[in-house]
UniProtKB/Swiss-Prot annotation:
Belongs to the DNA mismatch repair MutS family. HAMAP family: MutS. One of its GO terms (biological process) is mismatch repair. PANTHER family: DNA MISMATCH REPAIR PROTEIN MSH1, MITOCHONDRIAL, DNA MISMATCH REPAIR PROTEIN MUTS FAMILY MEMBER. Gene3D superfamilies: 1.10.1420.10, 6.10.140.430, DNA repair protein MutS, domain I (3.40.1170.10), MutS, connector domain (3.30.420.110), P-loop containing nucleotide triphosphate hydrolases (3.40.50.300). This is DNA mismatch repair protein MutS.
Amino acid sequence: MRPIDRQIYRPPDFRTTFLQTADTKDKTKLSTGAAEHTPLMKQFFAAKSDYPDLLLFFRMGDFYELFYDDARKAARLLDITLTQRGSSGGAPIPMAGVPVHAYEGYLARLVALGESVAICEQIGDPALAKGLVERKVVRIVTPGTVTDEALLDERRDTLLMAISRSKQGYGLAWADLAGGRFLVNEVDSVDALEAEIARLEPAELLVPDEDNWPEFLRGRVGVRRRPPWLFDADSGRRQLLAFFKLHDLSGFGIDDKPCATAAAGALLGYVEETQKQRLPHLTSIAMEVASEAISMNAATRRHLELDTRVDGDTRNTLLGVLDSTVTPMGGRLLRRWLHRPLRLREVLVQRHHAVGSLIDTGADTDVREAFRALGDLERILTRVALRSARPRDFSTLRDGLALLPKVRTILAPLDSPRLQTLYAELGEHDATAHLLISAVAEQPPLKFSDGGVIATGYDADLDELRRLSTNADQFLIDLEQRERASSGIATLKVGYNRVHGYYIEISKGQAEKAPLHYSRRQTLTNAERYITEELKSFEDKVLSARERSLSREKLLYEGLLDALGGELEGLKRCASALSELDVLAGFAERAQALDWSQPELESAPCLHIERGRHPVVEAVRDQPFEPNDLDLHPDRRMLVITGPNMGGKSTYMRQNALIVLLAHIGSYVPASRAVIGPIDRILTRIGAGDDLARGQSTFMVEMAETSYILHHATPQSLVLMDEIGRGTSTYDGLALADAVARHLAHTNRCYTLFATHYFELTALADASHAGGGSGIANVHLDAVEHGERLVFMHAVKDGPANRSFGLQVAALAGLPKAAVQQARRRLAELEQRGGDSHAAEMAPAALDAPQQFGLFTAPSSAAQEALQALDPDELTPKQALEALYRLKALL
């Protein structure tokens, strides 16, 4: 296997060293660095040469040190001190370091920033080494391959993804090493590829080192370019067969998926290369079927704010309202479900029935209460498989398995088919639970090296060795009393430190009374320390017992790992069942707490929602939420929604999309009733800003997202369109909005919620009725003026709006009174000159005719406009004089 990167590493300061020592006689030796660098630096360069693009944590005693460019980079990223460590090769050595006992925190920060780190450990014992202690890279930590608890977000999957491409499209493979999942997929377009990456959000992405990759991948954190030959379908197939010890891949359903196979092989090769060990927890590979899930592109996920708001905040999102899971593994499963709503009606009906059964029996409360003592078994089992489990992983697993009889008792009487399946998948693990109960201490230490991991009574030999250590305390007390009595020194003490071992301490003033058989061991400022033959013999015996005790514990620990390894598959199924049960119980809790109802999934096309609410807006608002209905069917496929800004148009559209999504993950929904027919896609075009990274304006982003919708929407798609055409001129925007609405209604024939400020579009409904049917109807949200206040009703009513209340909203936003007054005057002038442009007076065909609307005919002069903009009551004398000069200049 080749190293991670292909280039050969050269010490970064070689060229500088050569230039700075021009008077050196043998410049050839300097150019290679072999003759001038210290032995330690040679060892560093040898380790670094295999990992030139990774930060190298180089173990030196109690610190991991970084040198040269690594030190500079780490100092900048971690805000640690950049210093120097002498010189080597004729130049100072830049150095930065982190303490070994706290390195995981620094490592987590680097991984979160997309960095990869090679850990170079001291292999030999420094006390026994002659010359340099041996060092070796024993571990590579990359953003997509971490499995340590301290480096992971407990409620989010950490994924490694590989992408291959062919003439037919793209192959994707991704693995959750911390959870033991390995999946593949194939997509046929760049848009579909972007949608999958947006759904999965991989921490690290492997791609062939080639040109012409999609623009959205450029500059993305965590992208690793790899040699193209690693993404070969044939070699990938051989690698998968060897890894899983199989003769063919038909059991995984990927025999006819060469592009996905190529990606999977590249991913597996990278994992084996970086982890430097077997991966027994990856026992299969699954093929995702795109047709089984509702499709949502990146824009839709962003607009609906599933787990992250448009501004990047993770609060007040759908996941924030919905997530009532108790365990981290349940939280991760819920996030996966939320980002991949299913179209499989039977699966969803079973989930809904399970939630209902938990509610009706009150079992959800019992399950959630039991789960409060349940840890993250999924990730613990991964660490068991990788033999990196820590002492408290064993105790957490023990306590989790001890809960199983209680959970099984709760589920046994329930009549839900899905809950009974989960009951069976929990399995019976009494023997494993008993093993851990008898073998693991009640409260084990954090680190294995502290000892005390194995319970007393589990192993007789270990108990005997511990007794030697335990009895040592009493021996030392007795020895101290005897020595005080025999020497006559009342202040004599017996103690121990790690450097000098056991000792007898006598103060300087009493040192002359020390018996002749005392041998001086250490001299302090105020005391002398001694050793006796008896104490030396005891020391050898006790220290030997402690070393042997730790060795015995390690042997027993390895035996526990072996025993658990044989039960791994059943335990993984159990953890998976517990995760799903946690999610379903959370759904039940949310349904009761938030007054949600069970949706009805129909095979006939329809979308009927009664008294629907927006789950997030309702949760964060103090006042009651105004519920609204939605009724779409083959003869009523599009609603043109008009009304004032802030009136609730966007909220109404989003809430219906979220209700559909919630129904398709198995949750109850915020409505009194929801009847939902087949849905294959949710597509949205809601709000936008400039995409500066791609050099796209607001209008360009709007048109790109609209184009995607027009090309992909089907009669089973739900489409939300908000204010199409507002990013350009009035006429262009109106023409585009009209064309898009007609295309969606006549060509795509999808379910569409179309919010607009162009009242002219409300005439489309009249044309629909007159022409016999493109299924367009008008609805509106209204507001009422109460004195100087504007009260938004938030109720959706049939028919078009008669006012937009734009000026009133502007006043609410705090526009200067003069600007609002000028706007009112200008509006009156435009309405007088252009006539009433209400849609009821405008023929639908007008949009097809090559004419202007007369909106801005006979423009006023610049001087008139400037004069109308002035508010004399708000001008100072100086401002009034300046305004007069400006007006004169315009004449």
